């Protein structure tokens, strides 16, 4: 059913090959074991066949050369070593999401298929259990259920029995045998426990990146001149890879397999994928459900959303009332007038520093919220996304779901910051422009950090880079520290804090707060509309990074 010829697989383009000219054939309706010492290239071989890793050579499906990756993935599913599912979803919810993301199904069919899938893998009694509460063996069985949601013809399993107790291992193997015997599936399973080889129809041996045997267990024992399969790895270590390759090339069994031709079935009917809009709805529903179930995430988000505005209020209440006393009425003689003006200028300078600082403080806090919103959103679940994309999830639907969620969250935090501070501190200025400006700051920084999360594989790297990005916002804005003239308009277009600060301040032109600030700095300030336009450009750049990063394959 599935075969490869002269397949060479590399961890990345231009790197040293990990699998060298491998040829293997996995017949239809069989349970096939893929074995070899640790690090020999078993998983790499599977990933090369699936195009997860760059490869050279020929892949055949039903005896036909593969014409596209999509044609392969319509019939072949990949079950990784560790189940990739959201821990905060229940078992039934995980299966439901898989069905709705990969197939066009109605509600009645979904319910029926969920029951069928969970019964098939022995999780019928665990439908309401959170994934994070499952044991290791149950997680592996859930992984099989999720892969079977697309009803594949062939299932490639990467060490799904590794690290399990004997009972759990037997349960997994029983599920795999049932898939072959009762449903006619073809299953290829990477396995380490050589004592279980008697349960497989064929055994494929990989040694130092080369396929050196394929056949039934008795034939393997005869080929390597061993009595027990447990002696295999000791025997392999006695000779070089070249020796075993030459021995297999000269084997009569190898020649018989090369001459055998599997009948070509009719081309499989193309599986209809749900529309991008349908997948988008499923993803948004899942994201909201995950958000409310993750108490730590909810607590942190609420803490910064409501706590940061309180910090602004604490700093504002002690200083802003002094502005109400500012006046410049000409009373008394000439000397008294000069003294009054000097006093006014001193008071205005102090207040200008306070006002400008409070505005930039709000903007910086919103940038920090944006970093928290977006930095780990994709990098933290990259493996899950890549697995779902392989099964049929559209990258565009995934990217749009993240963009909508993160942008709305950031915009909402900006709006709340505006409302809270203005109501409690009676901050002057027009409500509309100030609300839009701070909402734009929150949304743009959230999306920019989301874009970084999409192009970086590690969530830690994405978080660190986002923190650096926020950290440089204040000094490079030119609001607190004066920049050299040559740098002002070189860096300013990229600094969200400047545009948020300027747009917010320009909405206060009718107040003494604005007059106090411009007395100290008479430089050009962007009006709110201009600030929002630049912040919108920042958001567009972040969105471009997001969609580009999601289109690229980045398996962890």
Where are these predicted regions, by residue range?
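Q-loop/switch helix immediately C-terminal to the Walker
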Residues: 82, 87-104, 113
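Hydrophobic anchor residue at the start of the ABC signature
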Residues: 144, 172
């Amino acid at each position: 059913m599935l075969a490869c010829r002269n397949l060479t697989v590399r961890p990345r383009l231009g790197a040293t090959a990990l699998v060298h000219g491998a040829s293997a054939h996995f017949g239809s309706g069989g349970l096939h074991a893929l074995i070899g010492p640790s690090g020999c290239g078993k998983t790499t071989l599977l990933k090369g066949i699936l195009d997860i890793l760059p490869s050279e050579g020929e892949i055949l499906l039903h005896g036909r050369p593969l014409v596209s990756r999509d044609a392969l993935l319509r019939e072949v599913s990949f079950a990784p070593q560790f189940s990739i599912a959201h821990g905060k979803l229940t078992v039934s919810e995980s299966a439901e999401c898989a069905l709705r993301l990969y197939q066009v199904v109605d509600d009645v069919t979904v319910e029926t298929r969920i029951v069928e899938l969970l019964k098939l893998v022995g999780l019928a009694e665990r439908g309401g259990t959170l994934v994070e509460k499952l044991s290791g063996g149950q997680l592996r069985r859930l992984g099989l259920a999720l892969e079977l949601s697309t009803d594949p013809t062939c299932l490639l399993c990467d060490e799904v029995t590794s690290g399990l107790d004997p009972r759990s291992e037997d349960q997994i193997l029983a599920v795999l045998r049932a898939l072959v015997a009762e449903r006619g599936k073809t299953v290829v399973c990477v396995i380490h426990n050589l004592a279980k080889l008697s349960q497989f129809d064929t055994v494929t041996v990989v040694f130092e990146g080369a396929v050196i045997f394929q056949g039934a267990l008795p034939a393997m024992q005869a080929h390597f001149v061993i009595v027990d399969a447990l002696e295999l790895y000791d025997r392999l270590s006695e000779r070089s890879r070249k020796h075993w390759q030459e021995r297999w090339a000269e084997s009569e069994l190898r020649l018989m397999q090369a001459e055998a031709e599997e009948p070509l079935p009719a081309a499989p009917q193309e599986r209809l994928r749900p529309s991008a809009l349908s997948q988008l709805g499923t993803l948004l529903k899942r994201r909201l459900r995950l958000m409310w179930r993750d108490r730590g995430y909810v607590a942190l988000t609420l803490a910064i959303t409501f706590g940061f505005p309180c910090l602004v209020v604490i700093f504002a209440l002690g200083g802003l009332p002094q502005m109400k006393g500012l006046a410049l009425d000409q009373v008394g003689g000439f000397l008294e007038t000069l003294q009054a003006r000097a006093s006014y200028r001193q008071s205005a300078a102090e207040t200008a520093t306070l006002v400008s600082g409070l505005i930039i403080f709000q903007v910086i806090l919103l940038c920090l919220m944006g970093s928290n919103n977006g930095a780990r959103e994709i990098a933290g679940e990259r493996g899950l996304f890549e697995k779902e994309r392989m099964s049929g999830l559209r990258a565009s639907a995934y990217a749009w779901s993240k963009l909508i969620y993160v942008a709305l969250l950031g915009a909402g935090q900006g709006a709340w910051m505006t409302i809270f501070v203005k109501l409690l501190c009676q901050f002057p200025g027009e409500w509309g422009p100030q609300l839009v400006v701070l909402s734009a700051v929150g949304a743009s920084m959230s999306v920019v950090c989301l874009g970084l999360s999409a192009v970086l594989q590690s969530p830690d790297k994405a978080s660190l880079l986002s923190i650096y990005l926020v950290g440089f916002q204040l000094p490079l804005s030119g609001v607190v520290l004066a920049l050299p003239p040559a740098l002002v308009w070189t860096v300013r277009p990229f600094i969200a804090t400047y545009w948020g600060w300027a747009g917010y301040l320009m909405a206060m032109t009718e107040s003494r707060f604005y007059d106090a600030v411009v007395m100290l700095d008479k430089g050009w300030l962007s009006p709110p509309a201009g600030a929002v336009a630049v912040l919108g450009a920042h958001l567009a750049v972040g969105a471009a990074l997001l969609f580009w990063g999601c289109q690229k394959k980045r398996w962890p």
